[in-house]
UniProtKB/Swiss-Prot annotation:
UniProt keyword DNA damage present: yes
Domain I, as annotated region: 1-64
Subunit structure: Homotetramer. Forms an RuvA(8)-RuvB(12)-Holliday junction (HJ) complex. HJ DNA is sandwiched between 2 RuvA tetramers; dsDNA enters through RuvA and exits via RuvB. An RuvB hexamer assembles on each DNA strand where it exits the tetramer. Each RuvB hexamer is contacted by two RuvA subunits (via domain III) on 2 adjacent RuvB subunits; this complex drives branch migration. In the full resolvosome a probable DNA-RuvA(4)-RuvB(12)-RuvC(2) complex forms which resolves the HJ.
UniProt similarity note: Belongs to the RuvA family.
Protein name in UniProt: Holliday junction branch migration complex subunit RuvA
Role description: The RuvA-RuvB-RuvC complex processes Holliday junction (HJ) DNA during genetic recombination and DNA repair, while the RuvA-RuvB complex plays an important role in the rescue of blocked DNA replication forks via replication fork reversal (RFR). RuvA specifically binds to HJ cruciform DNA, conferring on it an open structure. The RuvB hexamer acts as an ATP-dependent pump, pulling dsDNA into and through the RuvAB complex. HJ branch migration allows RuvC to scan DNA until it finds its consensus sequence, where it cleaves and resolves the cruciform DNA.
GO molecular function, one term: four-way junction helicase activity
Alphabetical keyword list: Cytoplasm, DNA damage, DNA recombination, DNA repair, DNA-binding
Domain comment (free text): Has three domains with a flexible linker between the domains II and III and assumes an 'L' shape. Domain III is highly mobile and contacts RuvB.
Cell membrane keyword on record: no
Pfam families per UniProt: HHH_5 (PF14520), RuvA_C (PF07499), RuvA_N (PF01330)
Region (Domain II): 65-143
Amino acid sequence: MIGRLRGVLIEKQAPEVLIDVNGVGYELQMPLTSFYELPEVNQPTTVYTHFVVREDAQLLYGFITKKERSLFRLLIKANGVGPKLALTILSGMTASEFVGCVERDDIVTLVKLPGVGKKTAERLLVEMRDKLKSLMEASVGSEREFVLQSNYSPAPTVNSAEEDAISALLSLGYKPPQASKAVSAAYKEGMDSETLIKAALKSML
C-alpha cells in the first residue's frame, strides 16, 4: 500500500495533481482544502495517501494531514459511500461542519452536497456518529477545515477564473446550471480561481 508520497509537484488542476517521486509521476485526487495548501508547481511537497484498487483502475487519493485521510477512510466504510462521494463530502464542508451535521442530525445540510440523497444522509448520520466522535476527540486542537469544490464546463462568456471554478464544481457532481449560477453570483473583479471556488461552494451550502 502507498501511504505517503514525497516529491515535486508537477501539475495541479483541482481536484487532481501530479507528483514526481524519483522520476515516477503519481496522479492523485485531493479534497479542496488539501489542494489549496499545496505549494506552487515545481516545488517539493509531501502528501498522505489512500490507495484504491478497482477492476478497471488503480486510484490514489491524497491528503495534507493524516486526520483528513482518517476521516476519508471512515467515510468510505459507510454504506453507500465510495471514494468519489467521500472526496466530495470532504471538499464540501469543514471537518467541524460535518461533525456538527452528525451531532445535530442535520439531513438538510448534507443533502445539499452533490450525490448525497436523503437515504445516504440518514445512513451517514447513524453510522458516523460514534466513529466521528472518536476521531475528533483524538485530534482536538488540530482540526483542519475542508472546502468544497466541483467541476463544470465553462460558460461561453466567463473569464479564466470563472472557467476554472465552474470546471471544479462540475468535477464534484454539481449540474452545469447550478455551477454557472453560483460562480456568476460569487464572482468579484480580481478574484482568482481558488478564491472564487471557495465562495461559490460556500453559497450553495
